[in-house]
Amino acid sequence: MNSKHQKTLEAVFAKPTSATIEWGKIELLLIAIGIQCVEDEGSRVSFLMNNHRLDLHRPHLGKEAKRYQVKDVQSFLVLIGVKP
């Protein structure tokens, strides 16, 4: 994981939850951690690791992830043992 990924990880865990994190940066972070990204129908994306799964939809308008998406990513990372 490089310094850009580390900054994104810190932003995901920041309080209050940010709504200005670019979705692409979140995807790159998850892939850098070793999480498998599976493209589904439409804008649906699944992230898989250690028998855990996170299903999300890519944002349609704008490139920033919604707060609930950032919280879901944060919960998933905690579940698989990743912390900043």
Residue ranges and their predicted role:
Residues 1-84:
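Basic nucleic-acid-binding interfaces
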